[in-house]
């Protein structure tokens, strides 16, 4: 740990702690943060304040002549002018100057030295520094000594609100990025995930410029060196399924695919912790120990034991820990070209097969669609699922238009003969309220069969509604759950629900039809007689 002169950033605190050790950050948090406590496991528990999740409606990107033609402008990437960005940056600097103690975390984004980014975090909460200590790739003492000027700087003044009267502001929260300045400013939210996703957004912009595909996915590697990618929206099982005791974890959330293979962007994991148990997710459960940050969790005031089932603060409880806290993590987080690409969906309608083989065209269709479905809510009378479509299984983080990422993925699939699969971790045996979630042990068995090649060789039957090739048998999985229509007591009700979902797919894909090749559009679901 060393002090750092921050005057070049307009910040001159009494004390600056640079790359402080977790033990020191624990002390700082306990001493200066009234929400901090040490859990029974040794992890640091903390509250993020009013915001317990990301604020996508408050994200802004500076519109600049050098980059404006690259960016997918719209509700995902809303513009801010450079002058307003500078106003917000000065507001953040002014706030940070009122703090006696400032924490700096320098680290890398990207395990491949040829593509990594030097990142500097400037913040006023010890927990934010510890969080990014976990999430960035931690430099060695030699690397820290020669770190030099960063490629990207985050000013985290999340305890201080934005001025709602400032141009382009929609609330007291503002998360602003300038690709030209290589800076990010956070105001009005203390949710640590904003920093993580800010780094990802920058990588999502810079990497495609180098012909490197950036992806919202997890990745793992078998003992023979075979690599699998797992794409999926929140709650589909991306983190759970990639933390496989029989495979090495490359990473759980953000990766890039270059001409040399895949590499993890991060040095840690940010796992959802609601309902966490040692029986279901032992790798994640056992990673929660000294050095881990537990965000917005309820614990017993006497024993300090965490209740993972208590969501009274938020459903979005999280654990942040270094990658090497996973027993079979691969360090450095790099692997070869993927052999299997697995798209995960949580289909709450109960109509999609639990596993199916995709053609390259179907892979592109489902990548652009990025479908999952969740229950609408807990209000009385609300019992229908809501479909969610998120391009590239991570539209919230895309910078370029989705078709750019899809075309890059298609090129890499063709160049490296990767197999593509669609795995439904959602409902089977009937509609929501009647059916049940596909048991995790069955989903794991399907993933195992993909990895050992038995599912590729298994006999398959084309499912008529979605046009997917469905295996008729899979080791350690009951055959009668593989065809979804056959699991419903009322086949006609299945047909009606499936037709409804097909219509939602079609409605969503219309916005991409002009850019997508006809073969990709035709690879989508088509209703036929059952």
Swiss-Prot record:
Keywords: ATP-binding, Cytoplasm, Decarboxylase, Gluconeogenesis, Lyase, Manganese, Metal-binding, Nucleotide-binding. Its main location: cytoplasm. Its EC number is 4.1.1.49. Pathway: Carbohydrate biosynthesis; gluconeogenesis. GO terms for biological process: gluconeogenesis. It holds the Pfam family PEPCK_ATP. PROSITE patterns: PEPCK_ATP. Gene3D superfamilies: 3.90.228.20, Phosphoenolpyruvate Carboxykinase, domain 1, Phosphoenolpyruvate Carboxykinase, domain 2. SUPFAM superfamilies: PEP carboxykinase N-terminal domain (SSF68923), PEP carboxykinase-like (SSF53795). One of its GO terms (molecular function) is phosphoenolpyruvate carboxykinase (ATP) activity. Mn(2+) binds at residues 197, 216, 253. This is Phosphoenolpyruvate carboxykinase (ATP) 2. It catalyses: oxaloacetate + ATP = phosphoenolpyruvate + ADP + CO2. One of its GO terms (cellular component) is cytosol. Belongs to the phosphoenolpyruvate carboxykinase (ATP) family. Substrate binds at residues 54, 191, 197, 318. Its cofactor is Mn(2+). ATP binds at residues 197, 216, 232-240, 281, 318, 437-438, 443.
């Amino acid at each position: 740990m060393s002090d750092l002169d921050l005057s070049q950033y307009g910040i001159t605190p009494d004390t600056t702690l640079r790359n402080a050790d977790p033990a020191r950050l624990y002390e700082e948090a306990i001493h200066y943060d009234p929400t901090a406590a040490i859990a029974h496991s040794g992890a640091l528990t903390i509250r993020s304040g009013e915001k317990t999740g990301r604020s996508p409606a408050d994200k802004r990107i500076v519109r600049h002549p050098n980059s404006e033609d690259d960016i997918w402008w719209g509700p995902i990437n809303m513009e801010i002018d450079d002058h307003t960005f500078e106003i917000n940056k000065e507001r953040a600097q002014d706030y940070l100057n009122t703090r006696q103690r400032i924490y700096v975390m320098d680290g890398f984004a990207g395990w491949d030295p040829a593509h990594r980014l030097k990142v500097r975090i400037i913040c006023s909460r010890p927990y934010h520094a510890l969080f990014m200590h976990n999430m960035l790739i931690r430099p060695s003492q030699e690397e820290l000594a020669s770190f030099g000027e960063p490629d990207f700087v985050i000013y985290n003044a999340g305890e201080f609100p934005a001025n709602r009267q400032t141009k382009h502001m929609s609330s007291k929260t503002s998360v602003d990025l300038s690709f030209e300045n290589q800076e990010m400013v956070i105001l009005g939210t203390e949710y640590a995930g904003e920093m993580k996703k800010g780094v990802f957004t920058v990588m999502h912009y810079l990497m495609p410029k180098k012909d490197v595909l950036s992806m919202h996915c997890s990745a793992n590697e078998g003992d023979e060196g075979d690599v699998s990618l797992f794409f999926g929206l929140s709650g589909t099982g991306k983190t759970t399924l990639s933390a496989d005791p029989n495979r090495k974890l490359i990473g759980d959330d953000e990766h890039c695919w270059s001409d040399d293979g895949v590499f993890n962007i991060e040095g840690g994991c940010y796992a959802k912790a609601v309902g966490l148990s040692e029986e279901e997710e032992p790798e994640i459960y056992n990673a929660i120990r000294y050095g881990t940050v537990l965000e917005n969790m309820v614990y017993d005031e006497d024993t300090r034991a965490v209740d993972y089932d208590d969501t009274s603060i938020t459903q979005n409880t999280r654990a942040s820990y270094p990658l090497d806290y996973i027993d079979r993590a691969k360090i450095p987080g790099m692997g070869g070209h993927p052999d299997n690409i697995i798209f995960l969906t949580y289909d709450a309608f109960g109509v999609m097969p639990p596993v199916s083989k995709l053609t390259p065209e179907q892979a592109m269709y489902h990548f652009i669609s990025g479908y999952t479905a969740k229950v609408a809510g807990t209000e009385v009378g609300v019992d229908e699922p809501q479909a969610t479509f998120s391009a590239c299984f991570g539209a919230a983080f895309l910078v370029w238009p989705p078709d750019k990422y899809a075309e890059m993925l298609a090129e890499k699939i063709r160049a490296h003969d990767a197999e593509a699969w669609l795995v439904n971790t959602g409902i089977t045996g009937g509609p929501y309220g009647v059916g049940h979630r596909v048991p995790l042990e069955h989903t794991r068995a399907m993933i195992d069969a993909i990895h050992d090649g038995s599912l590729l060789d298994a006999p398959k039957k084309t499912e008529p509604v979605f046009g997917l090739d469905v295996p008729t048998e899979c080791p350690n999985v009951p055959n009668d759950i593989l065809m979804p229509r056959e699991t419903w007591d009322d086949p006609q009700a299945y047909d009606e629900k499936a037709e409804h979902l097909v219509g939602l797919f079609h409605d969503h894909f219309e916005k991409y039809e002009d850019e997508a090749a006809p073969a990709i559009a035709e690879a989508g679901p088509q209703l036929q007689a059952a």
